[in-house]
Amino acid sequence: MTRKTNQTVLTHGGDWAGFAAEYGAKAPLLDVSANVSPLGMPAGVAAALAACAPGCDRYPDPLCRALSEAIGQAEGVPAEWVLCGNGAADLIWRAALALRPGRALVTAPAFAEYEAALDAVGCTVERYALREADSFRLDEGFLEAIRPGVGMVFLCEPNNPTGLTTPRPLLLRVLERCRQAGALLVLDECFGDFLADPAAHTLKGELDGGGLLILKAFTKLYGMAGVRLGYGLCAGTALLAKLRAAGQPWAVSTPAQAAGLAALRETGYVEAVQALITAQRPRLAAGLKALGCRVVPGEANYLLFRCETPLIEPLRRRGILLRSCGNYHGLGPAWYRTAVRTGPENDRLLAALGEVLGCGN
C-alpha cells in the first residue's frame, strides 16, 4: 500500500497508525495488509520482553552471541554463519551497502525493499518479468538473465507477493548460474516456514559452497513485526565481515535478542500457526473466487488476487486494511494481497468484500 501520511510515502502494508489517525485509535481494525501470524505474539515471547527490562540500562551484545548460537542450533548451521539484524530489511540494505553491485537482478513482482536498497547505492536494477499467464511463476528464462556483470541476484522463496515457490531443481540451477557469473544470490526465505514442506525449499544445505546469503526473520512466523529481528545465514567469512561492517554497532536491541531466544522455544506455537494457515488458506481462496476474484494459488500465509473494483478505501471505511499491489512492478491497481488470518477474521474480510462488490455477503 502506498499512502502519503505527513508527506511521507509508505511503501508497505501494516499502516495501523495511519488508520488510527484517520478513524480514531479505538476503531475496530482488521489488518490483512501485513503477513504476520494471526495468533499474535507467543506468550513466552511477551514474558521475555518484560523480563529483560532490568538489563536494558546496558548496551546489548553487539554480536548477539547467545541468539546466534541458538539460531545456529535451530537451523543446523554453525553459529559463525549467523548474522542477526534489525529485521530482514536491515540485512537487505546491508547487502547492498556492503557490496555496492553495479548491476543486480530481481523478479517483477517482488518485495520492494530489494530494489529500494539497490537504488540507494546507485545500482542498475534489471527486472525479470514473471508472466501473469503463468500465474507469475519463475521459469528457466531467469537463468539467461544471470550473466557476467550482474553482481547480485535477489530471489524470494516463496515469492512475495505471489506466495508461489520455485521447483528445487530450478532453484539449484539459479544458484549454480550465480556462482558461474560471480553474482551473490540473496535468497529471502522469510516466509519459508509457512510452506507445507519448508525443508524442500530451503538452500541451507548449499551454504558451504559460497555465493549465497539466506535471509530469515522472526517477524512473520512469531507475530513479532514490532520487535524488528531478522538474521542472515552465510558461510563466507569475508562476506559476513562486510555485512557486519555495513550495519550500526548495536543493530539488535536487548529486548529483540531476548524475544528471539524465547521464540525459538515456541515449537508448539509454530505448529499451531502452521496448522491454522494450512486449514484457512484454501478456505479463504475459495471465498475470494466465489466473489469473482482471480486468485493466484499461493502456498504461504497470504494470497494475491485480482479484482477490477477498487477495494482499498471501501474496506478502510469498514475497518479493514488490505494491501494494494499497485506499486509492485509487473502488477497494477487491480491486484491485491491479503494475509491469511483466523476463520472469523477471514469471514469478516469476505463479508466486507461481498458488500463492496454487491454480492450480498
What residue ranges belong to the model's regions?
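Active-site pre-lysine segment of PLP-dependent enzymes
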Residues: 119, 136-149, 161-221
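PLP-dependent enzyme catalytic core of the Aspartate aminotransferase-like
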Residues: 169, 317-318, 327-361
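Conserved PLP-binding catalytic core of the aspartate aminotransferase-like
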Residues: 277-278, 288-319
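PLP-dependent aminotransferase-like
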Residues: 9, 97-155
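Short loop-beta-helix segment that forms the pyridoxal 5′-phosphate
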Residues: 60, 72-94
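N-terminal "arm"/small-domain region of PLP-dependent enzymes with the aminotransferase-like
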Residues: 1-58, 183
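Short beta-strands and strand-loop turn motifs
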Residues: 31, 127-129, 152-159, 185-189, ...
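PLP-dependent aminotransferase class I/II
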Residues: 41-42, 63, 211-296
